[in-house]
A protein has these predicted regions:
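Mid-domain Rossmann-like dinucleotide-binding core that forms the NAD(H)/NADP(H) cofactor-binding site
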Residues: 116, 153-228
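Adenosine-nucleotide cofactor-binding segment
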Residues: 195-273
């Protein structure tokens, strides 16, 4: 019998008959092997990549609470036009959750595993939406003494994404960055990293409150897309920073078009040679 009899896990399933199901089911926690530990999960973020697995197939206007195979579940319809896109996972019960943090409550016999007993660690590797996760000790990053799990639960996905933005900028020879939805958790990390590494950043937000978050961090070019002078300020910021690479976290809408248009106009302000085909942006 497992030493964690009440352990549970979240599963996501798209059924053959066009339903999207999120169910909470019992989970048999395996005994940790020599170099493994059991982490009792305390904080797990929801990233867009997680949402893609959890709810991308669902028409959320149809969501309802049901009991499926004796387990509590949220059920939503999958529109007929969407069903072909999810045929590859139809009928498959999938686990979700990229990363998270919690306390080590059991450990294998190795020195490395035993050294983590009782410590709060952050981990990555999928299947994190469960009460307990078995992981190799070498995959666990201990948090500082006294640090709560929620402070370390996003240690991997967003920080690596922010660093990836800057690495891409440098690899492609750009001078600065544009980022939308810039007051998000990722956006704040990117802002701090850009300030630390001297990378010009133009941050696009949608409210005064979001703007204040970033100006308090120290950013200079924070532009509210809801204001009438948005395009004028965007062009001016791009002309000043020379930013020619954008990462659009919104998806859909016209923002990407606005940014590219502003980049063209900013290039003209900076004295780019005229071409009927536009600039090299």
């Amino acid at each position: 019998m497992s030493q964690f009899p009440d352990a549970k896990q979240l599963f996501t399933t798209v059924t053959e008959d066009g339903k999207s199901i999120l169910s909470i089911e019992p989970y048999a926690v395996p005994e940790p092997k020599e170099h493994e530990v059991v982490v009792q999960m305390e904080a797990v973020p929801i990233n867009p990549s997680d949402l893609g697995l959890l709810t991308a197939a669902a028409n959320m206007d149809t969501v309802r609470s049901e009991t499926v195979d004796g387990h509590p579940a949220l059920v939503a319809d999958v529109e007929p036009a969407m069903q072909p896109f999810f045929k590859g996972r139809a009928g498959k019960k999938l686990a979700a959750g990229n990363e998270g943090a919690g306390k080590v409550v059991a450990a294998g016999s190795s020195d490395a595993a035993q050294a983590l007993m009782g410590k709060t660690v952050t981990i990555v590797g999928g299947e994190m939406y469960r009460t307990h996760r078995v992981m190799p000790a070498m995959m666990c990053v201990p948090l500082p003494e006294g640090a709560p799990a929620k402070e370390g639960a996003s240690l991997f996905v967003n920080p690596m994404t922010a660093q990836g933005f800057i690495n891409t900028m440098r690899a492609e020879g750009h001078e600065g960055l544009v980022h939308t939805a810039a007051a998000s958790n990722l956006g704040q990390m990117l802002a701090k990293l850009c300030l630390k590494e001297g990378v010009p950043l133009v941050a696009i937000v949608r409210s005064d409150a979001q703007k204040k978050i970033l100006t308090d961090i120290g950013l200079t070019h924070v532009i509210d897309s809801t204001k009438d002078d948005f395009m004028d300020k965007l062009i001016a910021a791009l002309a000043e920073t020379g930013a020619t690479l954008g990462f659009d976290a919104i998806g859909g809408g016209k923002m990407a078009s606005y940014i590219l248009t502003a980049m063209e106009k900013a290039a003209a302000v900076r004295g780019a040679e005229f071409s009927v085909y536009g600039s090299t942006v």
